[in-house]
């Protein structure tokens, strides 16, 4: 659900602290803190933060593969760290994640030719992301069972602007907020289910929220 329309670094908190003792720390924090959509590289990892501007969402890049995001009564946002391009890699993540309402923790990314948005969902809040989706089977991976689904978005935001595209989902039946995800197992299962894969664009360990509140601190490798 990503449309990178506004690439502005949130530096408003710098004003007023430049003359204060220890102000360099405040400036550095402000450089890391994002409140509007942006992509880039941080400590060797690709990061992506997209928000539709609703509610309050603050994203911070930490050391290495770490990131933190806090949201209150948000509209819709997706944020995280990973790689660009993605690949059939094994992803490890750990930390804390909680959502009071509609939210997902997933290995998330995009493919092109065809344009595909995909989720390997590790945990979610009050809303089951498979609601209304077409069930295509299951895959056993990394000590758990995932249900496979397909949905289609029409005239929706994408990495190529407003477009119509398919979404592929693997949704873990037992929630977790740390572990290893062997993405190749999911890509192979999707192909076996008849889903066409494209060329990798970015891949991140993502926190997504929709009309909810919550917080996450995660480290990706």
From Swiss-Prot:
GO terms for molecular function: endo-1,4-beta-xylanase activity. Its main location: secreted. Coiled coil: none annotated. GO terms for cellular component: extracellular region. Residues 33-221 form the GH11 domain. It catalyses: Endohydrolysis of (1->4)-beta-D-xylosidic linkages in xylans. Keywords: Carbohydrate metabolism, Glycosidase, Hydrolase, Polysaccharide degradation, Secreted, Signal, Xylan degradation. PANTHER family: ENDO-1,4-BETA-XYLANASE A-RELATED. Its EC number is 3.2.1.8. The lineage of its organism: Eukaryota, Fungi, Dikarya, Ascomycota, Pezizomycotina. It is found in: Secreted. It comes from Neosartorya fischeri (strain ATCC 1020 / DSM 3700 / CBS 544.65 / FGSC A1164 / JCM 1740 / NRRL 181 / WB 181) (Aspergillus fischerianus). It comes from the Eukaryota. Endo-1,4-beta-xylanase involved in the hydrolysis of xylan, a major structural heterogeneous polysaccharide found in plant biomass representing the second most abundant polysaccharide in the biosphere, after cellulose. Pathway: Glycan degradation; xylan degradation. Belongs to the glycosyl hydrolase 11 (cellulase G) family. Residues 1-19 form the signal peptide. The active site is at residues 117, 208. It is an enzyme of class 3 (hydrolase). GO terms for biological process: xylan catabolic process. This is Probable endo-1,4-beta-xylanase B.
